């Protein structure tokens, strides 16, 4: 559950970076390089989670998990599977929600480039548009990172309050 929240921040950063052509900036030669936006969001999210007491709540959840899953008893797969699927779907939904402003700006940018290219076919619109989308992506990250992290920590706190989503 909690790990999926971190993955949702990474995914949101990846979607945002790919939407704004910033996915390879400072990319490493590792197996799965995460864009710089993803690193920024994950580090900010982890710092925010620690300030909100994630470490205490995680220890509390581990202790209370023995009430739900007693030692030497297997969990029923027919109840765990739907919960896991809901968590994965919710994490991806949260990631897209967090990165939606970047995707919207990307669509507007591409439509604008298409109109400009249609109006002036001899103009190299990529040379004009690339700095614009790069600057817009960085400016959007500057403005939206606090809001993104606030929405994320609220969702994490809600999950930590009731991890199984019951009434």
Per-segment meaning from a language model:
Residues 1-167:
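Hydrophobic alpha-helical segments and their helix-loop boundaries in membrane
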């Amino acid at each position: 559950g909690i790990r999926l929240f971190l993955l949702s921040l990474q995914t949101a950063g990846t979607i945002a970076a790919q939407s704004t052509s910033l996915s390879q900036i400072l990319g490493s030669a590792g197996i799965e390089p995460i864009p710089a936006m993803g690193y920024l969001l994950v580090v900010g999210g982890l710092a925010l989670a620690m300030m909100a007491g994630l470490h205490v709540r995680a220890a509390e959840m581990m202790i209370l998990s023995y009430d739900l899953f007693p030692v030497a008893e297997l969990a029923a797969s027919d109840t765990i599977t739907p919960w896991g699927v809901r968590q994965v779907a919710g994490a991806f939904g949260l990631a897209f929600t967090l990165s939606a402003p970047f995707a919207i700006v990307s669509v507007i940018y591409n439509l604008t480039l298409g109109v400009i290219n249609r109006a002036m076919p001899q103009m190299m619109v990529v040379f004009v548009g690339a700095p614009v989308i790069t600057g817009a992506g960085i400016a959007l990250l500057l403005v939206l990172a606090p809001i993104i992290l606030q929405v994320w920590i609220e969702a994490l706190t809600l999950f930590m309050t009731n991890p199984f989503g019951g009434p």
